A protein has these predicted regions:
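Short alpha-helical
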Residues: 72-76, 105, 132
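Alpha-helix termini
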Residues: 55-59, 114-120
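Short amphipathic alpha-helical segments and helix-helix/interface helices
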Residues: 52-56, 110-111, 134
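Alpha-helical substrate-recognition element adjacent to the catalytic core
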Residues: 2-100
Length: 151
């Protein structure tokens, strides 16, 4: 029986991809530029952040581990994670063509998954650097932590 679920965002939480990010005048992510910069060459220049070690630790401790990212995942993204030894039980990502705000997207995807019998009663915690995501997930009963709060 699954009792604990640890969920990790990618960008800004377990992966530093800031070299590929562009923002709009209001400070939000320029999704079109992000997708344009999602080439294998640029993805392989991403850096793993220290919190990524928690995925390994929590998995070893028996947690069901997940990545929930607003990225549209490509083969290069999966290869990058594998090369870095980041092997969660499940990865949830943005569907191609979806432009929903990150918090809304992640809340919808996780709520749907956590309605499944095996996940309903588990304790759920999400590590995410985005305040809007943390707020949206708290509204559906998922505890959230900013990566800077983890020692």
């Amino acid at each position: 029986m699954i009792t604990n679920i640890s969920i990790f965002d990618m960008d800004g939480t377990i992966v530093d991809s800031s070299h590929r990010q562009a923002t709009l005048p209001d400070g939000t992510l320029n999704l079109d530029a992000w997708i344009e910069n999602a080439t294998p060459e640029k993805i392989f220049k991403d850096k793993v952040l220290p919190l990524a070690e928690q995925i390994r630790k929590r998995h070893k401790a028996g947690d069901y581990t997940m990545i929930c990212t607003a990225r549209v995942m490509s083969e290069a993204d999966y290869e990058f994670l594998m090369n870095e030894g980041i092997n969660p039980d499940k990865i949830i990502s943005r569907p191609l063509g979806n432009t929903e705000p990150d918090g809304q997207l992640k809340a919808k995807q996780l709520k749907s998954l956590f309605n499944l019998k095996q996940f309903k009663k588990a304790t759920k915690i999400m590590f995410d650097d985005a305040a809007s995501v943390r707020s949206a997930l708290r509204k559906i009963g998922i505890a959230t932590i900013h990566p800077s709060k983890v020692k």
